[in-house]
Amino acid sequence: MDSKKIARINELAKKKKTEGLTPEEAVEQAKLREEYIAGYRRAVRHHIEGIKIVDEEGNDVTPEKLRQVQREKGLHGRSLDDPES
């Protein structure tokens, strides 16, 4: 999300606190917030999918659900062809 949209979200939030929003502004605010949240969720999901967890001995202890996602995306050398990866 670009900085202009974030500035608009903040502007609408400030206006809502001080004088209230028109129905059109409330709809705009809801759409902008939803877009912001969707982008944030994508970024967090992408970050988590890139994590590989290892214990003190160097063994891969990444949860199986995350390993499956990584296999599907070919991350960390994991492959759908190799269920042990």
From Swiss-Prot:
Q: Which GO terms describe its cellular component?
A: cytoplasm
Pfam families in UniProt: DUF896 (PF05979)
Q: Which HAMAP family match?
A: UPF0291 (MF_01103)
Give compartment(s).
Cytoplasm
Q: Which UniProt key words apply to this protein?
A: Cytoplasm
Disordered: region residues: 62-85
**Protein name from the UniProt record:** UPF0291 protein stu0508
Q: What is its main location?
A: cytoplasm
Is Ligase among the key words of this record?
no
State the similarity comment: Belongs to the UPF0291 family.
- Specify the species: Streptococcus thermophilus (strain ATCC BAA-250 / LMG 18311)
Q: Which PANTHER family match?
A: UPF0291 PROTEIN CBO2609/CLC_2481 (PTHR37300), UPF0291 PROTEIN YNZC (PTHR37300:SF1)
